[in-house]
């Protein structure tokens, strides 16, 4: 079907988002056209503001509008434990369960040789710098239970073995091949309780 160029451009923009195909993009584009102009301008401003005002925490790599982020700035958190996750959305999922009171480290990906992504391409070097702090007693590896997540967890555990820091892996109450962001709070809580040393 042929659409006017502004609709086609809008649809193309929506299709750049994950999980949005042509039908969903058309539905969203026509929804936007039906919105009040003020609402469309607010929506556009929110997108631009988020892109301009958010960055990554210089300590843990979590997305934030302040540096360091609210988690790293919270003096009540247990600074002897660092939970390593793949993405910022995993931090948000872990925080929803309200059981973990330590700190986080966001890798921004996983090791994936098939995609040409090695350890130096994700946030592992910064993790190693953080672990030079003598107060760190445990690193919890909470990468996703898929091939890349397991490979990344195994790589980090082998890297840390000589350090004497306790390295644990969250239990697999999570489905193999699943993502942390889609797990409910109870499943995540049980996975944290059942973590094991690696």
UniProtKB/Swiss-Prot annotation:
<dbReference type="Pfam" id="PF21176">
    <property type="entry name" value="RecR_HhH"/>
</dbReference>
<dbReference type="GO" id="GO:0006281">
    <property type="term" value="P:DNA repair"/>
</dbReference>
<dbReference type="GO" id="GO:0008270">
    <property type="term" value="F:zinc ion binding"/>
</dbReference>
<dbReference type="InterPro" id="IPR000093">
    <property type="entry name" value="DNA_Rcmb_RecR"/>
</dbReference>
<dbReference type="InterPro" id="IPR023627">
    <property type="entry name" value="Rcmb_RecR"/>
</dbReference>
<dbReference type="GO" id="GO:0003677">
    <property type="term" value="F:DNA binding"/>
</dbReference>
<keyword id="KW-0234">DNA repair</keyword>
<dbReference type="InterPro" id="IPR006171">
    <property type="entry name" value="TOPRIM_dom"/>
</dbReference>
<keyword id="KW-0233">DNA recombination</keyword>
<dbReference type="InterPro" id="IPR034137">
    <property type="entry name" value="TOPRIM_RecR"/>
</dbReference>
<feature type="zinc finger region" description="C4-type">
    <location>
        <begin position="57"/>
        <end position="72"/>
    </location>
</feature>
<keyword id="KW-0863">Zinc-finger</keyword>
<dbReference type="Pfam" id="PF02132">
    <property type="entry name" value="RecR_ZnF"/>
</dbReference>
<dbReference type="Pfam" id="PF13662">
    <property type="entry name" value="Toprim_4"/>
</dbReference>
<keyword id="KW-0479">Metal-binding</keyword>
<comment type="function">
    <text>May play a role in DNA repair. It seems to be involved in an RecBC-independent recombinational process of DNA repair. It may act with RecF and RecO.</text>
</comment>
<protein>
    <recommendedName>
        <fullName>Recombination protein RecR</fullName>
    </recommendedName>
</protein>
<keyword id="KW-0227">DNA damage</keyword>
<dbReference type="InterPro" id="IPR015967">
    <property type="entry name" value="Rcmb_RecR_Znf"/>
</dbReference>
<feature type="domain" description="Toprim">
    <location>
        <begin position="80"/>
        <end position="175"/>
    </location>
</feature>
<dbReference type="GO" id="GO:0006310">
    <property type="term" value="P:DNA recombination"/>
</dbReference>
<dbReference type="Pfam" id="PF21175">
    <property type="entry name" value="RecR_C"/>
</dbReference>
<keyword id="KW-0862">Zinc</keyword>
<comment type="similarity">
    <text>Belongs to the RecR family.</text>
</comment>
